């Protein structure tokens, strides 16, 4: 049973979980607020304004939870870039393949390819016969910033992943469609993530409507436009289903609006369906909406 930790702009969540008979068994969960402005997600600029303060928050949280040693971590989506890269060949050795793909992606990056950290999954072949690979890329200097904080908090980061990718891992049983979309909110941002055969394929990070009475129309239109663009430029197969997650009181309203715009079945993602039955551990909020990334990090395959 492993530990998963989500580092967000407003709080840190830590849980211990594993998978039993296809469902998540949650053993322990606790969270702590993060001072405003302490974490500002960026792919190229420093993310943590005061590492000592964040270290103190995480160390206290880990001690309360009884967490020591290795932990798998979900970071805000804007720390990462998700791109599909096409190539005629790929080195067989995985480390060599990563270096090769970093070089291939050099013109897509707002930082030097020398500093890139990249992981990838195969996404089949395109119409031109070239191999397609979905790559999750981050600036190694930014990841090292988070790693130092975790190590100073007496934790060992086993893996660093994007929030929405970790959420999709937690909800993998619910997202089991050949091609499925997920819109998940994280404060003032929302990520549109498309998965094919259970694997991340494309994403776009969008701004949510402001808090001044916005009804979600602009966000709904941007989701529809983004999907149309993906289908035109990335050979994206039609979606079979679409899920909405974490939009607060507007979640159901946005799901209804997307049903009308996209003309396909849209559901609200209910993470409780991914968990084993039984009592939830003390320290967990009444509803699970905010815990998807921490859960997904905990059950992430090594």
Residue ranges and their predicted role:
Residues 1-302:
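Hydrophobic/aromatic-enriched cytosolic interaction surfaces used to assemble or bind macromolecules
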């Amino acid at each position: 049973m492993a530990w998963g930790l989500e580092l967000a702009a407003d709080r840190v969540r830590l849980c211990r979980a594993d998978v039993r008979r296809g469902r998540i068994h949650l053993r322990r969960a606790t969270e702590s607020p993060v001072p405003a402005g302490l974490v500002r997600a960026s792919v190229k600029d420093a993310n943590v304004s005061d590492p000592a303060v964040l270290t103190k928050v995480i160390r206290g949280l880990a001690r309360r939870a009884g967490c020591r040693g290795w932990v798998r971590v979900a970071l805000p989506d804007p720390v990462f870039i998700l791109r599909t890269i096409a190539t005629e060949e790929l080195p067989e050795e995985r480390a060599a393949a990563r270096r090769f793909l970093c070089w291939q992606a050099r013109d897509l990056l707002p930082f030097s390819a020398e500093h890139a950290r990249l992981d990838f999954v195969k996404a089949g072949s395109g119409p031109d016969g070239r191999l397609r690979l979905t790559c999750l890329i981050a600036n190694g200097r930014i990841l090292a910033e988070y790693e130092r904080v975790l190590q100073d908090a007496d934790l060992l980061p086993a893996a660093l992943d994007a929030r929405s990718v970790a959420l999709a891992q937690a909800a993998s049983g619910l997202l089991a469609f050949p091609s499925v979309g997920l819109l998940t909110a994280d404060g003032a941002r929302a990520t549109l993530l498309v998965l094919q055969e259970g694997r991340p394929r494309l994403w776009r990070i969008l701004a949510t409507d402001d808090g001044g009475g916005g009804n979600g129309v602009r966000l709904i239109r941007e989701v529809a436009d983004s999907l149309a663009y993906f289908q035109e430029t990335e050979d994206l197969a039609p979606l079979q289903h679409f899920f909405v997650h974490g939009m607060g009181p507007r979640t159901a309203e946005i799901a209804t609006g997307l049903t009308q715009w996209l003309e396909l079945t849209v559901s609200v993602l209910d993470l409780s369906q991914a968990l084993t039955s039984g009592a939830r551990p003390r320290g967990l909020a009444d509803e699970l909406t905010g815990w998807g990334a921490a859960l997904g990090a905990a059950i992430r395959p090594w």
